[in-house]
């Protein structure tokens, strides 16, 4: 009985990752109009985002990227959490001439939740 009470107490004290993941899923919802996390899905307006963290910018071979992203790829830029968060804040400022129409995510917490979500989907 004592060990059950201790486990119950610990479960209440430890932070849950469920709300954070829910925030990331919610933040990704508008992205689904153009992007997928299913590595097998092709033919969408935007590149597949499965495994985006650690991947070269403009790194999905069969996707037709804007010239600015092809240049970034040729320069060896890679997506990490910091670069992705800055990109999501203002994509066109980071890559002028970008074909993507998304203006950016103003809310810092929402951007961070989306980046964490993409990191977690990359590491699964």
Sequence positions of predicted segments:
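Sequence/structural segment immediately N-terminal to covalent heme-attachment motifs in c-type
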Residues: 20-44, 49
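A short secondary-structure junction motif
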Residues: 52, 56-59, 91-95
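C-terminal capping alpha-helices of c-type cytochrome domains
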Residues: 78-124
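Bacterial N-terminal signal peptides
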Residues: 4-15
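Extracytoplasmic/periplasmic, Sec-exported soluble proteins
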Residues: 23, 41, 75-79, 106
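Short Fe-S-cluster ligation motifs
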Residues: 59-78
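Residues at helix-coil transition
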Residues: 14-15, 36, 54, 89, ...
């Amino acid at each position: 009985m004592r060990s059950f009470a201790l486990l119950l107490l610990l479960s209440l004290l430890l932070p849950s990752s469920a709300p954070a993941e829910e925030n990331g899923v919610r933040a990704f919802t508008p992205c689904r109009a153009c992007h997928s996390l299913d590595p097998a899905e092709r033919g969408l307006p935007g590149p597949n985002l499965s495994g985006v963290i650690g991947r070269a910018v403009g790194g999905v071979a069969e996707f037709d990227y804007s010239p600015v992203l092809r240049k970034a790829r040729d320069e060896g830029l890679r997506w990490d959490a910091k670069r992705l968060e800055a990109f999501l804040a203002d994509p066109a400022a980071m890559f002028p001439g970008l074909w993507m129409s998304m203006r950016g995510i103003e809310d810092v917490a929402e951007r961070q939740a989306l980046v964490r979500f993409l990191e977690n989907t990359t590491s699964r």
